Amino acid sequence: MPGNTKKSADSGLTAKDYYFDSYSHWGIHEEMLKDDVRTLSYRDAIMQNPHLFRDKIVLDVGCGTGILSMFCARAGAKHVYGVDMSEIIHKAVQIVEVNKLSDRITLIQGKMEEIQLPVEKVDIIVSEWMGYFLLYESMLDTVLVARDRYLAPDGLLFPDRAQIQLAAIEDADYKSEKIGFWDDVYGFDFSPIKKDVWKEPLVDTVDRIAVNTNSCVILDLDLKTVKKEDLAFSSPFEITATRNDFVHAFLAWFDIEFSACHKPIKFSTGPFSRYTHWKQTVFYTHKDLTVKAGEYIRGTITCKPAEGNHRELDIDISYTFNPREPNREPVSEDLSYRMC
């Protein structure tokens, strides 16, 4: 490749490597770059803190089009190394060149786990590693490899904190459309498909008015200390109904923080915040609940990488609802989902 660029010996793509190949297409990068919440949060965290980046060596894990690398260079970084497996890196090289930053940005094509940086340690790692439900198709395990191998003892991660939140929602119309649809498909019974539809979480934007409980943190990550095995987790939860309503699903989203900044910068992908391309994740229950304000739904959510594809997720939710009045029946379910 022209310019200040390197390519690892083992970086050739294969037809089977769909995940990395999907990031070679322009559409996904356009969607991410146009996500103002995402991109401006990174820009502000980096460029409003030049005192942290000045004369520092920075590693950009999964650099994509190079936007974060260029933010770092503009913030005063001595040199930025961007690593990406996808073929998009060829265009990133040209983008860096036309922005006259080739003298301070080196792009390397390859897997982070396999490449060798030309430096022993870096001062800062930046990465936009998050996926749906935070962990679906995420690169966090790759960021942790980079952290353990290259980050200086007093180094910084951007971002460095992440949380997943869980709440419940009323969603009768869409649940009927998504699940009930299979009972009568142009006069035919397609119900054998329903059990598979139940298992697939829906990634979509949910109106804030649908949320009818408080939220509960089910995962809280400090990227400076978290280990790969921590990404498979089991967490109890308790959420409280905020009004008399029906519950048709659980809703999850994540929040991100850059706490190393002079003024910490945060953003949320939840229904009470501005739209992001991550949207929210809906887990429909088999049973519908009738709740009254102040009543609790208690349970446990378990998440682990799927066997055979660690970027997919197996998620189990077990919950119990005990109404206050004895004439109302308790409800409990054990639900299993696959994000794929």
Swiss-Prot record:
Source species, domain of life: Eukaryota
Reaction catalysis annotation: L-arginyl-[protein] + S-adenosyl-L-methionine = N(omega)-methyl-L-arginyl-[protein] + S-adenosyl-L-homocysteine + H(+); L-arginyl-[protein] + 2 S-adenosyl-L-methionine = N(omega),N(omega)-dimethyl-L-arginyl-[protein] + 2 S-adenosyl-L-homocysteine + 2 H(+)
Residue span, SAM-dependent MTase PRMT-type domain: 16-311
Gene3D superfamilies associated with the record: Hnrnp arginine n-methyltransferase1, Vaccinia Virus protein VP39
Binding residues for S-adenosyl-L-methionine: 29, 38, 62, 84, 113
PROSITE patterns assigned to the protein according to its UniProt record, in alphabetical order: SAM_MT_PRMT (PS51678)
EC number: 2.1.1.319
CDD domains referenced in this protein's UniProt entry, alphabetically: AdoMet_MTases (cd02440)
Similarity annotation: Belongs to the class I-like SAM-binding methyltransferase superfamily. Protein arginine N-methyltransferase family.
Subunit structure: Interacts with pab2.
Protein name: Protein arginine N-methyltransferase 1
Gene it is expressed from: rmt1
